[in-house]
Amino acid sequence: MVEMESAKSVLEPLAWLMQMITGLLMILLVTAHFYVTHMTTHDALRYAEVVERVAQPEFKALYALLLLAVSFHAFNGLRAILLDTNAGMRKKGAVSALTTLAFLLAFFYGLYLLFSI
């Protein structure tokens, strides 16, 4: 029987800590996003309202931080899943490089879209 390792044992301590921090940060930011878009007014989801809201610097900062947290959390989690496999552990450097590259591409593309509004 193959013994499985937990994500905590596969990830380095800093990567595991960042996974926990980004998870908690996402709870706060998604709650704020949900409140603003669904609880304040029924017009909050109209295109004009969304563009007006996202044009404000504080909302750009909120969404940029949410984008950073979600992107890191997703690709760090994917890295942990891949490192749980035998093939992933044999190619640990490649797995780390590819997931880091994917994180950076997703984050910077998201920033480009956010700031092009």
Swiss-Prot record:
Transferase keyword on record: no
Main localization of the protein described in the UniProt heading: membrane
Pathway the protein acts in: Carbohydrate metabolism; tricarboxylic acid cycle
Cofactor: heme
Domain of life of the source: Archaea
Cellular localisation: Cell membrane
Extracellular side: 37-61
GO biological process, one term: tricarboxylic acid cycle
Membrane-spanning parts: 16-36, 62-82, 93-115
Cytoplasmic side: 1-15, 83-92
Molecular function GO terms recorded: electron transfer activity; metal ion binding
Keywords: Cell membrane, Electron transport, Heme, Iron, Membrane, Metal-binding, Transmembrane, Transmembrane helix, Transport, Tricarboxylic acid cycle
One Pfam family cited in the UniProt record for this chain: Sdh_cyt
Subunit-level organization: Part of an enzyme complex containing four subunits: a flavoprotein, an iron-sulfur protein, plus two membrane-anchoring proteins, SdhC and SdhD.
Name listed for the protein in its UniProt record: Succinate dehydrogenase hydrophobic membrane anchor subunit
Source organism of this protein record: Archaeoglobus fulgidus (strain ATCC 49558 / DSM 4304 / JCM 9628 / NBRC 100126 / VC-16)
